[in-house]
Amino acid sequence: MESYFPPGATANHSSIRTSSPASTPLSPPTQRSNALSNRLTSVLSASYADSDIRDALETLSLRGVHNTAETRRQLRLDVQKEVVECNAEIVRDFGKVAEHIVRAKQDTAPVIEEASALMNQKKESETKQQLLDAFVKHFVVSDDDLLVLTSAEEPIDDRFFDVLDRVKQVHHDCEVLLGGENQRLGLELMEKSSRNLNSAYQKLFRWIQKEFKSLNLEDPRISSSIRRALRVLAERPSLFHSCLDFFADARDYALSDAFHYALTDAVSGSGGDRNVKPIEFSAHDPLRYVGDMLAWVHSTTVSEREALEALFVADGEEIAKGIQAGLSSEPWSRIDEGEEVSFDGQKALSDLVNRDLVGVSRALRQRVELVIQGHDEPVTCYKVVHLLSFYRATFSRLLGTKSNLADMMQTLENFTFARFESIMREQVNVLSNDHAALTPPDDLSAPEFFLDALEELTSLMKTHDASLGAEDAESESTADNKFTPVLRVAFDPFLQLAKSSAAELPDATARAIYTTNVLLTARSTISAFPFASATHLNPISTALSSLRMELLEIQHRYLLDASGLGVLLAALESFSPSPTTSKPESEGKDGHAPPQADRQPTDIAEIADLPAFQQEALIAVSQQLDDFLPSALMDATDNLKHLQSASFVQSVTEEAVEAFCRDFEFVEGMIIGADEARGRVHIKRTEDGSDAGVEDDVVTESGKVPDGDEQESGLRRLFPRTTGEIRVLLS
């Protein structure tokens, strides 16, 4: 038992009581008075009214303790003694309790062991019961559920799919049972679940086939049950593809019947909407007829794809996942065993749409070929070619480049273009045997058949230009573009016929003018279209350049003949530059002369002895030149009056006039040179005394009389025209 007073409390009180007498006698009286006051204050301020002090005082009171000095000194020891005695008695009592417990344990040990064994057995039994219940609940399917799964009388509803999911899970979990030592249970359960699954898939397959017979794809509210059934059936690829084959055959028949009804308004089985006019009765030309059929096929293809997307792809990749799982579970259905099998949903969808439209494609091809074979209008055929090309690109984007519809559009496009080529060849053959059509017109303009061909070509080029996209414009401007085959059959043969018909004309001038008119007309037609100019403009321009040089020679020769200058040039031919002198062919034809200093031979004085330079002949040429010059430019232009390009005539005439002026300058220079040479000869003869002098005046080496007058003499007097005058009159 603990002490009722804090340890050292008594000593503290006694020290307090004895502290004052211990003060030194030398301490001041004031300090002793303050210490006593502080002590009294401390004692008086202590409170003895709290509960702990009251309880302690009450306990002392009950023990009968007297407040004496001896008692206060022994109180602590007495209390500790009592505590020790109490503790010893408690220990003795607990020892008796321990002995009692040991005896009780010895007596109950067999009972406890038996009870423990029973409890363990109970726990094992409960665990086995739980395992059995869980096994039965998970691996055993009730007869009612199996009836829903396999019976043909039971409907395909949510319960069917729930039971099917459970049986599939049981079949999958049987793999765990096969991992143990005893595999009999797992094998039996797997065999049973496999039979149930096969029966369920067969039931689902027959139900989907039945639903497909009455399925209306035009109805946007397609049953969710059939979509779910297709997703589930996809886990059996063989059944799923058989189902798709059945569906494709049914849709092929339905769409073929619908196409026939759209064409003829005679659907098999029942009447249709009489407000819709059949295509064969509303389309009055081949282009409209083919366009309406293609538009119907395109609209049907889009609708069919959208409906099949809603049926097969609306729920994401569930069908693809199911088929992938089925391919993994049916390895014997793989074609390429060494390759990883993957399912492309979009490709499968496009293939299904292609199969649905097999009958429609066959009917469309037959009708288009019949229409094209019976039509002889090339422009319409070419428009059909572009229409087919447009739908080929459309179906390629919709179903893929290797789809049946895209291939059929390509085949029809090639067939129609071959028909177009055949029509153009027939026209060329007919024209080749029509002599009247090939005869050039009197005005030497382009022939009528060529103008008709260019008119058709313009329509073809406009059709092609309208069909070009912005991304194709640049590529179409290169050589050998898509329009080049058209030009080869619709332009080149007619141009060749027009050029060959020039042989009917009597003279070279008419032939050159006629051929030039043909080429100018052709150039003006194709130059407006870059895709045609890219391949045919350069050859035409080259041919026109050659014809221009020929017309320039003709015009130049006309000026020389009409003016009489040609006679003088012919006489001076021996005074022209030597054959070794290099000059362009055109200058050789035009008779252009190099500068006078390079053309004066040593015997230039003999020019006056030539017949063409005798007085009468030279006066006649000079008079002919004077008569020609006032109307020379108009006459020269009139010489090419049948040429249909005024600018072409002007440029050729101007160059011919320039060549004529150079020829005149050459003749003038030779005449002046001859006079000067004769003057030098006369002077030499005078100095030698062999002659009395000149005819009228003495001519110096400079060709002038001694008195300084500018009087001309000799040939120059007979041929007074100057190059400057000629240029002014012909400007």
From Swiss-Prot:
Its membrane topology: Peripheral membrane protein
What Pfam families would the database entry show? COG6_C, COG6_N
The keyword Transport is assigned to this record: yes
UniProt keywords (A-Z) are: Golgi apparatus, Membrane, Protein transport, Transport
User: Where do the segments described as Disordered lie?
Assistant: 1-36, 578-599, 686-714
The GO annotation for biological process reads: intra-Golgi vesicle-mediated transport; protein transport
Query: Which top-level group of life is the source organism from?
Result: Eukaryota
| Principal location listed in the UniProt entry | Golgi
Residue ranges annotated as transmembrane are none
Disulfide linkage: none
An annotated GO cellular component of this protein is:
Golgi membrane
What InterPro entries does its record include? COG6, COG6_C, COG6_N
Bias (Acidic residues) occurs at 689-699
What does the UniProt entry say about where the protein is found?
Golgi apparatus membrane
Q: Which family does it belong to?
A: Belongs to the COG6 family.
Describe the function of this protein: Acts as a component of the peripheral membrane COG complex that is involved in intra-Golgi protein trafficking. COG is located at the cis-Golgi, and regulates tethering of retrograde intra-Golgi vesicles and possibly a number of other membrane trafficking events.
PANTHER family documented for this protein: COMPONENT OF OLIGOMERIC GOLGI COMPLEX 6 (PTHR21506), CONSERVED OLIGOMERIC GOLGI COMPLEX SUBUNIT 6 (PTHR21506:SF0)
Can you say what this protein is called? Answer: Conserved oligomeric Golgi complex subunit 6
Gene name?
cog6
